[in-house]
Amino acid sequence: MLLPRIPHAFGRRRGPSVRRPARALLVLLTGALGLALAMPTGATASPPPASRAATDIAPSATGTPLRDGTGLYPRAIRLAHSGSANGRVLAGVVTFDGNNGIGAIHESTDSGATFRQVGAVADPESAAGQGLCCATLFELPRQVGAMPAGTLLWAASAGQDESNRRMALRIWRSNDIGRTWSYLSSCAVAEGTGGLWEPEFSVAADGALVCHYADETDAAHSQKLVAVRSYDGVNWQGRHNTVASSRAPDRPGMPVVRKLPNGTYFMSYEICNPGGQYQCVVHYRTSADGWNWGDPAHLGFRPETADGRYFRAAPTIAWAPTPGGGSNGRILLIGQRLLNRDGTPAAGSGRTILTNTQNGSGPWSAMPSPVTVPNPEVNYCQNYSSPLLPSPDGSRVLQIATDFEGTVCRAYFASGNIT
């Protein structure tokens, strides 16, 4: 299936990728993604009329705007390996300058109370309508090759709208806290027209830099999750599946990995195309070393509350220490929509974080999210892949979430207590 066109080829789809014209009319709609998800694989959705979320003048989201104009797929980190800059918060979003995709880097020196733009990644492979999607931001916690701890990495999907599409996950580095950036390497390059999406980084137990991503290039799988590693940030090796369903239409996507205090690596992701109430439901699985994740055909576990509520689509995770002690700390999880046990929208959808103090086992608890996106629909903007950044003492969490303002998808931030 094909999702309707979104601005300047931000272009993350939940169905098999096909090449589209580099310039197209903007179609923003609240229910379009949900409509496309319900269609059989290979179908093409005809754009319905723009709905309320795409035409309202004012946004419904709470919080403070991160920037003027477009801010897609936000990411946030707190520097912890950068000397005198430790404690600063950096936030990245995908935006556009005309038809050029840009990774805008913002900085806060007051724990996320205010932000200002301090840098930008302008990849020539994302310029002139070639396409840019789903960027990530990462601080190296230790030296990798010649890159010292504190080196910043930015990576994104590039090239989805080229006339002869060969997408790549292109990595850029910064040695000056995000002010300037230089190209480093690509952790994946497509041999054909299939898509490569949503890169995220972790450092495995052996010190390797690991790039996790969603891969549409395997004819045996509509989409799967893949990992590849590098010991110098330049040369990549060991590409292997981490989640690849035995059902070809299934689409695992949007992996995010965090290391827990006990050494376990925790990965959250969505799985689209099962249909019914479990369409794009959030799952997780774990690894002892951050590289070996077990049988890829094992789809993992669904985190849910004691009364059966669970998230649909676009998850992110974070780990927070427990104030006053506690060896496990807390895992924080957010997704685009919160559903009840029967698959109906839950009352807290767009305003809830789930937490767990047992390394993911057992029931999860619900708490209010700092940013509220009321009644989000399944689309590329509303509450889509919202990053969570706990305070160093684990008492508060910063969230950046996106919502429509008219036809513009904007990023909003706020902090709140972890309860």
Specify the residue positions occupied by each region the protein language model found.
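Hydrophobic core segments of beta-strands in well-ordered, beta-rich domains
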Residues: R75-G98, T136-E139, A146-R165, R170-W172, ...
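Blade-loop segments of beta-propeller domains
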Residues: I102-I105, T114-G159
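Loop/turn-rich, solvent-exposed surfaces of beta-rich toroidal or solenoidal domains
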Residues: C272, Q279-V282, D307-G360
